From Swiss-Prot:
It comes from Solidesulfovibrio fructosivorans (Desulfovibrio fructosivorans). Optimum pH is 8. Heterotetramer composed of HndA, HndB, HndC and HndD subunits. HndA and HndB could form a heterodimeric intermediate in the electron transfer between the active site of hydrogenase subunit HndD and the NADP reduction site of the reducing subunit HndC. [2Fe-2S] cluster binds at C98, C103, C139, C143. Binds 1 [2Fe-2S] cluster. This is NADP-reducing hydrogenase subunit HndA. Its EC number is 1.12.1.3.
Length: 171
């Protein structure tokens, strides 16, 4: 096992990858090995890793760095830069409320408040049972349906605070 402390810049290592199920790591390795070359595919590999694990904790970032033969700092830089990557687990049913201009003007902030009240969590949090998480996003491109809520891949248009309970009941 490698050191879990930093001796010099670029030498930080985390403990062995024991937190998450090993078959998931094998799936990521197989994906990396299927690439014609590693160079230039870090974002693609991170997307795959996030789809496999659901998020990108430091253990997964280190694993990707090791297998892509790049520094952990480079992986972390990419993960922390792009908003579509997350380092914290999401709920089984992630809720995203569009806060783009059209959605905001039509009451998206009130819809967010209704979800927060119903679930008793704040933006970025996960319910204690792991079922739901709430986040906001910028413009999903369906302005005619504002305000828009996404639960996983399912899109709800013209959502009002009064519909929040009904939406949650579907899950």
């Amino acid at each position: 096992m490698q050191n879990s402390t930093c001796q010099a810049v670029g030498e930080c290592r985390v403990p062995e990858h024991a937190v998450l199920p090993q078959p998931l790591y094998r799936e990521v390795v197989q994906f990396i090995e299927s690439l014609p070359q590693k160079e230039g595919h870090l974002v693609t590999v991170l997307h795959k890793a996030q789809s496999v694990f659901g998020y990108l904790p430091i253990e997964v970032q280190q694993f990707v760095a090791d297998h892509m033969e790049v520094p952990l700092a480079q992986v972390y830089g990419v993960v922390s830069f792009y908003t579509f990557f997350t380092m914290v687990p999401k709920g089984k049913y992630p809720i995203s409320v569009c806060m783009g201009t059209a959605c905001f003007v039509k009451g998206a902030d009130k819809v967010v408040h209704a979800f927060k009240e119903q679930l008793k969590i704040d933006i970025g949090d996960v319910t204690p049972d792991g079922r739901f998480s709430i986040d906001t996003l910028r413009c999903v491109g369906g302005c005619a349906l504002a305000p828009i809520v996404m639960v996983g891949e399912k899109v709800y248009g013209n959502v009002t605070p009064g519909q929040v309970k009904k939406i949650l009941a579907e899950y």
